Amino acid sequence: MSYKIMAINAGSSSLKFQLLEMPQGDMLCQGLIERIGMADAQVTIKTHSQKWQETVPVADHRDAVTLLLEKLLGYQIINSLRDIDGVGHRVAHGGEFFKDSTLVTDETLAQIERLAELAPLHNPVNALGIHVFRQLLPDAPSVAVFDTAFHQTLDEPAYIYPLPWHYYAELGIRRYGFHGTSHKYVSGVLAEKLGVPLSALRVICCHLGNGSSICAIKNGRSVNTSMGFTPQSGVMMGTRSGDIDPSILPWIAQRESKTPQQLNQLLNNESGLLGVSGVSSDYRDVEQAANTGNRQAKLALTLFAERIRATIGSYIMQMGGLDALVFTGGIGENSARARSAVCHNLQFLGLAVDEEKNQRNATFIQTENALVKVAVINTNEELMIAQDVMRIALPATEGLCVPA
């Protein structure tokens, strides 16, 4: 028996979606509604054989979901709203409360809204998306899938910041980590491809894209991750600085009379690859500029790789070794240069890349005699979300759900 599951990612002015047939994991359609709240909202829906695009007014998220469901019916992707058996919602922050994906109830939704203080740009709109789908599809169970939940297995030394204790105890300031859905999916696929239980592996997963994070996974548990209290921290990213000396901020604020909001804009939107290269936040553009001799672009690429290498080194120490290094995300999956730079001169760890395999994006790119496996695995957060819907909302199907 097959089930139609929707995976939803609601943004402040957008709604990204995918409809999957489960447990096969086949994508039936995917799309995006952008510029919600505007008279010229952009609607894109794609199947394997067709693509529809139009510009229409979309007043709010309720209008967006209503429009999406109307289009699925109109394009005969579904015959009835009852064809949708469940809906999975990506939620940015689960705090310490949610340690796994969960079936949405009124109480669950209220808790997601209360956690908005930890993710003010994301949780409110994630909750709004859940609320609208529950209204319009009352017979389809909704499941909340949290970016932070996979990292709730971190031990205290990995998540506590060396600040006065009350900042954690009273305000919840700690490392939470993000990209958990991606790290969980990719590590599961790796274990399946190796034919080894994830519980027997020490894995470092590099999710590299405009937002990047590194995750150490030991015996199937996240034991450390580079993003912290917010997705701004950790390694260098497209427009985000990652970790810097915190005293730089008050120094800049005093010298340039910047407000906290302006400092946040600087760290989140003007730094990283864009800030150092002066070219672009897109790794491909920076790579192209570096190839033409642009010194700052070359430096940006070097910094990007070195911050990742330093993080990998510390995680190998923490886990007492490494069995597999995995690359995923837009850069991790597509840039041979980035992978090569991260793995450069690591033969002393038993880690070496075969450049011919690397250039053709093979699944395993380590040399024949390397002790550490190096893998390139496409992430699929939507499939992971759909699998969690099956596991939690349709438990009779649990045995059918395996990573694709």
Swiss-Prot record:
PANTHER family: ACETATE KINASE, ACETATE KINASE-RELATED
Keywords (A to Z) from UniProt: ATP-binding, Cytoplasm, Kinase, Nucleotide-binding, Transferase
Gene: pduW
Swiss-Prot/TrEMBL catalytic activity: propanoate + ATP = propanoyl phosphate + ADP
Subcellular location: Cytoplasm
Induction, per UniProt: The BMC operon and BMC production is induced by growth on 1,2-PD vitamin B12 medium.
Domain of life according to the entry: Bacteria
NCBIfam families on file: ackA, PRK12397.1
GO CC aspect terms: cytoplasm
Function: Works with phosphate acetyltransferase (pta) to capture exogenous propionate and regenerate propionyl-CoA during degradation of propionate and 1,2-propanediol (1,2-PD). Ectopic expression partially complements a cobB deletion allowing some growth on propionate. Restores growth to an eutQ deletion on ethanolamine and tetrathionate under anoxic conditions.
Lineage: Bacteria, Pseudomonadati, Pseudomonadota, Gammaproteobacteria, Enterobacterales
Observed phenotype of the null mutant: Decreased propionate kinase activity, cells grow to lower density on 1,2-PD and excrete more propionate into the medium. A double pduW-pduX deletion grows as well as wild-type on 1,2-PD.
EC number in record: 2.7.2.15
Pathway where it operates: Polyol metabolism; 1,2-propanediol degradation; Organic acid metabolism; propanoate degradation
Record InterPro entries: Ac/propionate_kinase, Aliphatic_acid_kin_short-chain, Aliphatic_acid_kinase_CS, ATPase_NBD, Propionate_kinase_PduW
Family: Belongs to the acetokinase family. PduW subfamily.
Pfam family, any one: Acetate_kinase
Record GO terms (molecular function): acetate kinase activity; ATP binding; propionate kinase activity
Name the record gives this protein: Propionate kinase PduW
GO BP terms, alphabetized: acetate metabolic process; propanediol catabolic process; propionate catabolic process
